[in-house]
Amino acid sequence: QSDFSRNASTRLGSRIVELRSQLRDSVYTARGFPVAPELIATVETENTASAEKEGGALLGLALTPFLLLLMLTGGSIMAVDAISGEKERGTLETLLTTSAARSDIVTAKLLGIVTVGIAVAVVNILNLLVYLVLGVVDLPENFAVALSALDLVLLLILFLPLTVLISSVLLLLSGYAKTYKEYQIYFFPVFLVFLVPSLAGTLPGMDLRSAIALVPIAGIGVAVREVMVREYDWLFLFLAFSSTGAAAWWAARLTERTLSTEHLISQSDLDEADLVGGPALFPRRVLRWFGVMWVIFLIVSLWFGEDL
């Protein structure tokens, strides 16, 4: 079924429903019905939320994705140069010959990226303080947000594990990539993996008092929205912080262990697994082939799904 025929079918169905309503109303009118049918059981919508809650909810929907975007782009600039850039320039091997332990080098590079992410969060939280709390700039008449200094501190605390998680993944990505261009190719899928769960707060009916608090990144997105409307469920706020914090700790440990391998710090395309071959290559290639099979399955299901 082509797009043209699908659109034609939709428009025809709408016209048939409209015609049926007109015929039904004409029968009522012909039989002497005293009022117009559309005036029976009318429903009116009334917004009971305050202007502060409306403004906070609207700002809370966009705050997490916006800060995440800035953290990813800002941290990526430093991460790509931390390992991929040094590989390309040939300076990483020189750094590894110093007396500094490899774990210390990885930790220092990770802290550098974390510093960029924290700086992004702090600057934007200060912007909220200046514009919303101190009232330096007059807001539009229909837009109001009521935040206290404690709310801003709570927002900053919620963003801390997200910053560590992003920094760890970006540094790990830089370790896998051998050049700037290869890093840029890998960056876009990672960007989507972080962006999609951060939009959980935009889903209708999504409440922090559910299993979403245990989902990393998504729990932070919903928790930030709750704080912006000044609804504090401390237990679930702690769960959202802890779930993302646990993911950040795991990612940091994984980055430190992974970047200790010779294959990721050298420009050589071969390591022991490449030389041995066979089952030794399975852990490295299984995800790649699984991804290819998943893409093929998705394409086939989209193409032939209606006929199966």
Q: What is the predicted function of each stretch?
A:
Residues 53-54, 128-155, 230:
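Membrane-interfacial helix-loop-helix connectors in multipass membrane proteins
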